Amino acid sequence: MRERIATAKRVVVKIGSSSLTSDEGGHTVDPNRINTIVNALQARMEAGSDVIVVSSGSVAAGMAPLGLTTRPTDLSMKQAAAAVGQVHLMHQWGRSFARYGRPVGQVLLTAGDAGQRDRARNAQRTIDRLRMLGVIPIVNENDTVATTGVNFGDNDRLAAIVSHLVSADALVLLSDVDGLFDKNPADPTARFISEVRDGNDLKGVLAGDGGKVGTGGMASKVSAARLASRSGVPVLLTSAANIGPALEHAQVGTVFHPKENRLSAWKFWALYAADTAGKIRLDQGATEAVTSGGKSLLAVGITEVIGDFRAGEIVEILGPNGEIIGRGEVNYDSETLMPMLGMKTQELPDDMQRPVVHADYLSNYASRA
């Protein structure tokens, strides 16, 4: 798997805030650190790979110009810092890549962009066109307009979504840790985990929260790595200090193996990125049919419709006790669906005998482990 990452044609590389900012408080973008990273990225591109960068650091980069000594927690102040810092951040990326004659392009995304299929496709096309033009895409979350509860939460998840959007062959997550440990690596008894093949390899792992500068702790990186693996993308998690060997031969850090039964592009998007418009609750029989996979959802197994939605929108699918078991694209609006609940297909009018959610447009969480 490490060889597969080392030779991947299209690579998404995510760099955390702490890997881009100075040691003195982490409040300014460090040109030397960015140059070191770009040197390694250039070497990988010279070896024949396409590289897409997911860069954190806009809020951290805006702290010093605004006279802030601690990362803002107030939403409006965070957005102001991001607005100021993104300019500084892109300036440094541009200067560093210019040493090799490579232009950069800024791509700012929100969770709403990924949540709407047409907007996600537009983002994909933009990134693809930048690559065709020889431009290095620098992707970041648009913190200036993102709102609490409607955002990616951290750029680790954003990197996983971008990996899916661009059909990446590998994702490299860079931070300030050498890889995954079963507890705080400062603990001398901490055990390094070299390979993660499934959820069993993560049993007993304690992942902490984010640090002073960034928002993505180890828990978010593990979550993002597993998210990417569900779309068939192998992931390497390591320190930015190891970026050279990470991109050259991948013999460092922790590797997350991709799932063999990778989700289709639509099902991955529906489960992990799409906006949802409402909910439908199922009885036990329908729940078992959905979670076993391959079955369409029929009206007879639905017990409740929650919220207002239109035909063609994505809804959350709940089990009998309200647990979320999947998502799907509904063929009927909520008003039409209500009187259909519990009815067998043959009891419905001819124009209402389609499945409520066809199996091709139904994705469940049962196989995420």
UniProtKB/Swiss-Prot annotation:
Primary localization: cytoplasm
The reaction(s) this protein catalyses: L-glutamate + ATP = L-glutamyl 5-phosphate + ADP
Any one Gene Ontology molecular-function term assigned to this protein's record: ATP binding
Pathway(s) annotated for this protein in UniProt: Amino-acid biosynthesis; L-proline biosynthesis; L-glutamate 5-semialdehyde from L-glutamate: step 1/2
SUPFAM superfamilies: Carbamate kinase-like (SSF53633), PUA domain-like (SSF88697)
UniProt EC number: 2.7.2.11
All copies of domain PUA, residue ranges: 277-351
Role description: Catalyzes the transfer of a phosphate group to glutamate to form L-glutamate 5-phosphate.
Alphabetized PANTHER family for the sequence: GLUTAMATE 5-KINASE, ISOPENTENYL PHOSPHATE KINASE
Protein name per its UniProtKB record: Glutamate 5-kinase
